[in-house]
Regions:
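Glycine-centered tight beta-turn/hairpin loop motif at sheet-sheet or coil-to-beta transitions
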Residues: 114-116
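Short hydrophobic core segments
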Residues: 99, 118-133
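Short, surface-exposed beta-strand/loop "edge" segments at domain boundaries and coil↔beta transitions
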Residues: 40-41, 118-120, 206-213
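C-terminal segments that line or cap access tunnels to active or ligand-binding sites in enzymes
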Residues: 132-240
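A conserved short coil-to-beta-strand element within the FAD-binding core of flavoproteins
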Residues: 92-110
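Active-site/ligand-binding neighborhood in enzyme catalytic cores
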Residues: 2-98, 137
Length: 240
């Protein structure tokens, strides 16, 4: 297709003269909020796909991508799936068991763990994250396309930082600091049970950092949006 090999950086280069500096910053930062990659590694075609699913409007993007979410977080959604399966009495599971090898004999599938234990089944569903797929030996090997994807890795290097702050007037705030700040996009997400403001801020592959490794760097990135009195910080990553 026409846009299969076009990045967002390519497309922005074509139309950048139609933007003011502030508009260019807004467009670039919103794309990176969605992809958590870089403009060069974000597919323009995939972003068109998102735009179509959001009714071809920024309002749709906000409603479908940000406004509505699980009340108790995505982890609660996964936990409820697990509990429902467990309630059937037919689920067997094992945690903290890295896989080292998967062998498909056509009649059965063998999964061998790093500790040397082998499990056999008639079929298997593989949900190993892309960025760790190369740590597992497959027999027969992965297809060339899947191997190429595993070698490239996932471009999404999302950083999500939650901050509880005292400034109540920021509970409906939205801020952008691109390209210099380590957190690109942030917005107020209501109030905490203590009555303070809850901020959610995002970074990605651009100016990537690990929030939990240096709290002072994380605080500096948060205050890169606006002065704030920070009570508490929690960070998560979605880059596996």
């Amino acid at each position: 297709m026409q846009y299969d090999n076009v990045s967002v950086a390519d497309r922005i280069a074509e139309i950048k003269d139609t933007f003011s500096p502030d508009e260019l910053t807004s467009v670039s930062s919103f794309v990176l909020l969605c992809s958590s990659g870089t403009l060069e590694t974000t597919s323009f075609f995939e972003f068109l796909h998102w735009w179509a699913l959001s009714d071809y409007s920024y309002k749709g993007c906000v409603e479908y991508l940000m406004k509505y979410k699980f009340r108790n977080g995505q982890s609660s959604f996964a936990i409820n799936f697990f509990r429902e399966s467990l309630a059937t009495g037919k689920l067997k599971y094992e945690f903290n068991t890295p896989v080292s090898k998967i062998r498909d004999t056509k009649n059965s599938v063998e999964v061998t763990t790093r500790s040397g234990v082998t499990y056999t089944a008639s079929r298997m569903i593989c949900t190993i994250p892309l960025n760790v797929l190369n740590t597992v030996a497959f027999d027969p090997p992965l297809s060339s396309d899947k191997k190429a994807a595993a070698d490239a890795g996932h471009i999404n290097q999302c950083i999500k930082v939650h901050a509880e702050i005292l400034e109540r007037d920021m509970r409906s705030w939205t801020g952008v600091n691109y390209p210099n700040n380590k957190l690109i996009y942030g917005f107020g997400d209501g109030t905490t049970p203590a009555g303070n403001t809850h901020l959610v801020c995002f970074g990605g592959q651009h100016n990537h950092f690990e929030p939990e490794e240096d709290i002072n760097q994380t605080l500096e990135a948060l205050r890169g949006f606006a002065p704030m009195d920070i009570e508490r910080v929690v960070s998560t990553r979605s880059s596996i």
